[in-house]
């Protein structure tokens, strides 16, 4: 289908499902709304607007379904009724021909499939818009037979994606320029985010790298299993990972009859998530029930099994500090501190008044404290803070929105397992430990130890730097302001070098002594 024909199809679907009322209600040009009223044949206006939007996206195909799924995570931009409905979108499409999957594998590895795998199951076990999964057996580097899951990219996706993305970018530009809410909704930014997300999913090596990173991070935590990646069998279009065997986590009755401790399972999920967030700053961001199983094998009984690593989130130290302090200030009911954190983040316009933001946050948060602590949703706390921030034109960072969406998934899953789950009691030790690590002497020691070689290298250069500085003093007394400022900056740099160099020298000696002592004993 040509781009023009596809564009006509999209416009027809928008009008058929009455989405013009949703899109054009904030447009500055009344004549646009009048034109759309002329086209009334076959319109479906009896359902709520969120349902109509979901059905329209489903009728436009898998790329628009995935776009709706991404939109559902942007609850800082979407009204709750629309975000809730979009969260129901399912990325399910019929599997493609196994012969096409085999041809993709043979093209990727330039070998017949019989030379790549010991055996290959032609029947796919899962299928989505981007890829489908087959089971197979390989020989690893030691010659052992290993059961694996093979993810194969759906062929011909890139041209389809690029065509739909071009149309989305064009429509986003129209909405941003014509709608009164265009700037707040940031449609072009959302489409650009979706563009990056889709192209990341089209590179299965990237997903393999995400899985390998999570597996390495989680090795010391005996609560979760991450499949091993077989790099010799990975390609941009083919991903081969260890086959994991478990029970889907939403089959609670089956897990309970197998003897799994369900309340502990709920707590373990929270522990895994907060470990990934506050310890590692790298978290699995697609933890819905379809991507989580529970092992019933005797040696790993009751452990989580994580699958599908196409979406991950990363947090900087600043992001983690923002989250930890927001949560602790909220539970202390210190709304002024919450407001100050928003302003200190630099995401709030400079003219924002702390007391006004504090009052708005108090209005949102105070009703939560009429409930038992175990009923308070940290994900909803973040969501309400984001929604309040929107009124003050706060620029919420995408990684925090992704975390908020994932946190809601974790809470929903945890309370599905155990309605009495107290999320705060489970999360609090992580927040306290992380803040202690950030503020305590251990962090200072880690930073000094990391910089010791650099400071020790600077120290021998200090006499020469001091000599050069003294020789460059002006010969006359006429010194303008710019030269004074430049001289002051040079002096500050010199003093900083002296201080850091001295610290580095002392620290270097300590580290060397410690190293020698360890070698001796």
Swiss-Prot record:
Q: In the UniProt record, which is one GO cellular component term? A: plasma membrane
Segments crossing the lipid bilayer: 496-516
Where along the chain is ATP bound? 125-133, 151
Q: In which pathway is this protein known to take part?
A: Cofactor biosynthesis; ubiquinone biosynthesis [regulation]
Entry annotated with the keyword Membrane: yes
Primary location? membrane
Enzyme Commission number: 2.7.-.-
Q: What does this protein do?
A: Is probably a protein kinase regulator of UbiI activity which is involved in aerobic coenzyme Q (ubiquinone) biosynthesis.
NCBIfam families in the record: PRK04750.1, UbiB
- Tell whether Transferase is among the UniProt keywords: yes
> What's the encoding gene here?
ubiB
Q: What is the name attached to this protein's record?
A: Probable protein kinase UbiB
Show the CDD domains listed in the entry: UbiB
Q: Which Pfam families match?
A: ABC1 (PF03109)
What residues sit in the active site?
Answer: 286 (proton acceptor)
Q: By its UniProt entry, which InterPro entries does this protein fall under?
A: ABC1_dom, Kinase-like_dom_sf, UbiB, UbiB_bact, UbiB_kinase
- State the family it belongs to: Belongs to the ABC1 family. UbiB subfamily.
* Keyword terms of this UniProt record: ATP-binding, Cell inner membrane, Cell membrane, Kinase, Membrane, Nucleotide-binding, Transferase, Transmembrane, Transmembrane helix, Ubiquinone biosynthesis
Q: How does the record classify its membrane topology?
A: Single-pass membrane protein
Tell me the Gene Ontology biological-process terms attached to this UniProt entry: regulation of ubiquinone biosynthetic process; ubiquinone biosynthetic process
- Family matches, as HAMAP family: UbiB (MF_00414)
Protein kinase domain location is 119-497
- GO MF, any single term: ATP binding
> Any idea where this protein resides?
Cell inner membrane
């Amino acid at each position: 289908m040509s781009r023009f024909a596809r564009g006509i199809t999209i416009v027809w679907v928008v009008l058929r499902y009455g989405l013009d009322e949703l899109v054009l209600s904030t447009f500055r040009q009344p004549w646009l709304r009048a034109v759309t009223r002329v086209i009334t044949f076959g319109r479906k206006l009896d359902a709520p607007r969120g349902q109509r939007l979901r059905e329209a996206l489903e009728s436009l195909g898998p790329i628009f379904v995935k776009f709706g799924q991404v939109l559902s995570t942007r609850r800082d931009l979407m009204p709750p009724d629309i975000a809730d409905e979009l969260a129901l979108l399912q990325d399910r499409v019929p599997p493609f021909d196994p012969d096409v999957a085999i041809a993709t594998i043979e093209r990727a590895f330039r070998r017949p499939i019989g030379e790549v795998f010991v055996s290959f199951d032609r029947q796919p076990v899962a299928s989505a818009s981007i890829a489908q999964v087959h089971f197979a057996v390989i020989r690893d580097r030691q010659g052992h037979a290993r059961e694996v899951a093979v993810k194969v990219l759906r062929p011909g996706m890139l041209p389809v994606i690029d065509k739909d993305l071009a149309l989305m970018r064009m429509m986003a530009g129209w909405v941003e320029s014509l709608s009164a809410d265009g700037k707040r909704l940031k449609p072009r930014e959302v489409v650009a985010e979706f563009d990056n997300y889709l192209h990341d999913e089209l590179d299965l090596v990237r997903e393999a790298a995400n899985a390998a990173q999570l597996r390495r991070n989680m090795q010391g935590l005996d609560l979760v299993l991450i499949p091993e990646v077989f790099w010799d069998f990975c390609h941009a279009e083919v991903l081969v990972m260890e086959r994991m065997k478990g029970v889907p986590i939403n089959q609670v009755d089956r897990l309970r009859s197998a003897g799994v401790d369900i309340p502990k399972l709920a707590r373990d999920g929270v522990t895994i998530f907060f470990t990934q967030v506050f310890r590692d700053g790298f978290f699995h961001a697609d933890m819905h029930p379809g991507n989580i199983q529970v092992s019933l094998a005797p040696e790993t009984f009751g452990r989580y099994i994580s699958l599908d690593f196409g979406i991950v989130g990363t947090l900087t130290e600043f992001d983690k500090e923002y989250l930890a302090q927001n949560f602790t200030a909220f539970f202390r009911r210190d709304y002024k501190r919450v407001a100050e954190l928003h302003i200190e983040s630099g995401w709030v316009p400079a003219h924002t008044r702390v007391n006004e933001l504090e009052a708005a946050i108090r209005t949102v948060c105070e009703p939560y404290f009429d409930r038992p602590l175990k009923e308070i949703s940290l994900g909803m706390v973040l969501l309400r803070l984001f929604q309040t921030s929107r009124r003050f034109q706060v620029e919420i960072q995408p990684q925090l929105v992704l975390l908020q969406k994932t946190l809601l998934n974790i809470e929903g899953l945890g309370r599905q397992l155990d309605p009495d789950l107290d999320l705060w009691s489970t999360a609090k030790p992580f927040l306290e430990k992380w803040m202690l690590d950030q503020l305590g002497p251990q962090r200072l020691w880690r930073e000094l130890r990391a910089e010791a070689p650099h400071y020790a290298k600077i120290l021998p250069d200090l006499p020469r730097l001091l000599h050069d500085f003294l020789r460059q003093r002006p010969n006359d007394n006429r010194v303008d302001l710019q030269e004074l400022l430049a001289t002051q900056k040079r002096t500050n740099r010199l003093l900083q070098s002296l201080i850091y160099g001295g610290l580095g020298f002392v620290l270097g000696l300590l580290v060397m002594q410690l190293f020698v002592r360890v070698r001796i004993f």
